[in-house]
Curated annotation (Swiss-Prot):
Gene Ontology cellular component list: cytosol; nucleus
Domain of life (superkingdom): Eukaryota
Protein name: Ubiquitin-related modifier 1
Physiological role: Acts as a sulfur carrier required for 2-thiolation of mcm(5)S(2)U at tRNA wobble positions of cytosolic tRNA(Lys), tRNA(Glu) and tRNA(Gln). Serves as sulfur donor in tRNA 2-thiolation reaction by being thiocarboxylated (-COSH) at its C-terminus by MOCS3. The sulfur is then transferred to tRNA to form 2-thiolation of mcm(5)S(2)U. Also acts as a ubiquitin-like protein (UBL) that is covalently conjugated via an isopeptide bond to lysine residues of target proteins such as MOCS3, ATPBD3, CTU2, USP15 and CAS.
Organism: Bos taurus
InterPro entries: Beta-grasp_dom_sf, Mopterin_synth/thiamin_S_b, Urm1
UniProt subcellular location: Cytoplasm
Glycyl lysine isopeptide (Gly-Lys) (interchain with K-? in acceptor proteins) cross-link site: 101
Pathway: tRNA modification; 5-methoxycarbonylmethyl-2-thiouridine-tRNA biosynthesis
Alphabetically ordered keywords of this record: Cytoplasm, Isopeptide bond, tRNA processing, Ubl conjugation pathway
Length: 101
């Protein structure tokens, strides 16, 4: 069984508005059978942090196009995207690159 993880989850570029305007969240992910990955983190975020309009953040089992995801300041595309296995003390940043005009 995977141990609980302490992870910093941060939202920027307007994405924080979907989370009551709170940019940084220090969260403890509970222990579970499978290791935590970005895919399971997104499910947890949707259930526990997302306050409104989930369609602006989640599309299918991933983030919507236009949301940049950084894990420890590295582009998640270099780390395996949804399959990246989270480590204790990781920092995951979601930045919306879509803005109204």
């Amino acid at each position: 069984m995977a141990a609980p993880l302490s992870v910093e989850v941060e939202f920027g570029g307007g994405a924080e508005l979907l989370f009551d305007g709170v940019k940084k969240h220090q969260v403890t992910l509970p222990g579970q059978e499978e290791p935590w990955d970005i895919r399971s983190l997104l499910v947890w975020i949707k259930k526990n942090l997302l306050k409104e309009r989930p369609e602006l953040f989640i599309q299918g089992d991933s983030v919507r196009p236009g949301i940049l995801v950084l894990v420890n300041d590295a582009d998640w595309e270099l780390l395996g995207e949804l399959d990246y296995q989270l480590q204790d003390q990781d920092s995951v940043l979601f930045i919306s690159t879509l803005h109204g005009g």
